Regions:
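Non-globular targeting/processing and membrane-anchoring segments
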Residues: 141-208
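Loop/turn elements at helix/coil->beta-strand transitions in domains of secreted/extracellular proteins
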Residues: 40-44, 77-82, 111-114, 121-124
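Thiol-based oxidoreductase modules, predominantly thioredoxin-like and allied folds used
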Residues: 24-28, 49-50, 63-99
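Non-catalytic, surface beta->alpha helical segment in thiol-disulfide oxidoreductase systems
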Residues: 63-65, 103-151
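Local sequence-structure signature of Cys/Sec-based thiol-disulfide redox active-site neighborhoods
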Residues: 28-70
Length: 208
């Protein structure tokens, strides 16, 4: 496991002080985070981190996630923040929880720290951000790009619903192709719809 790191702030107000509570409101329970996101239709920001040994992870938390700028953005966009930690210090995390985090790491193909997955409440990711940035503003630009992917995916799927047959199939394929190829297999429902309209698997999505 390698760690990704781009090495190297804010106007303080009562509002930002209140928003900054987001920095201490990270969930650490996978199921609770997804349940909360699912109920509210909110996106999940899942941070795969080595909080006590990974320099890039420590930098990302201190210089990006614990800033007013990020806290405001996370609150405005109603993120459910989820920390999936891989500590090395003995006794910092129950072995069964660490084992579950390792299972999630394999499931989502996480190969470096820090890695952030943006996903829906059903666990389907729509974007991945690997490493840190020098400033919060640079990181927020990455989150904006991820949010645009999410919006485009939802809009393209919605546009397919009134269609039928080949037209619907092509629109659903277009929707799936909004995502990076490595994240497409997690869209189980969308792939099932495509497969039902494409029994000969001409588009090859049944194999995903």
């Amino acid at each position: 496991m390698r760690n990704s790191f781009f090495p190297a702030i804010g106007v303080f107000s009562l509002a930002s002080a209140l928003i900054c509570s987001a920095s201490s409101s990270w969930e650490t329970d996978w199921n609770k985070a997804l349940e909360k996101a699912g109920k509210g239709g909110h996106p999940v920001l899942a941070d795969f981190t080595g909080s006590d040994w990974c320099p890039g992870c420590i930098y990302l938390r201190k210089n990006i996630f614990d800033t007013d700028a990020f806290a405001k953005y996370a609150a405005d966009h109603q993120f459910v923040l989820l920390e999936l930690d891989f500590p090395k210090a003995a006794g910092k995390m129950p072995p069964e929880q660490l084992k579950f985090h390792e299972e999630l790491m394999r499931r989502y193909g996480v190969s470096s720290f820090p890695s952030v997955l943006l996903m829906e409440g059903n666990g389907a990711p729509y974007a991945k951000i690997v490493g840190a940035t020098r400033t919060p503003e640079e990181y927020l630009k990455k989150l904006e790009a991820a949010g645009e992917t999410r919006r485009k995916l939802k809009e393209t799927v919605a546009a397919a619903q009134p269609l039928k047959g080949k037209e619907k199939l092509e629109q659903l394929v277009k929707a799936l192709n909004v995502l990076p190829e490595d994240l497409q297999p997690f869209q189980k429902g969308l792939i099932a719809e495509i497969s039902a309209l494409d029994p000969e698997d001409r588009y090859g999505f049944a194999k995903k």
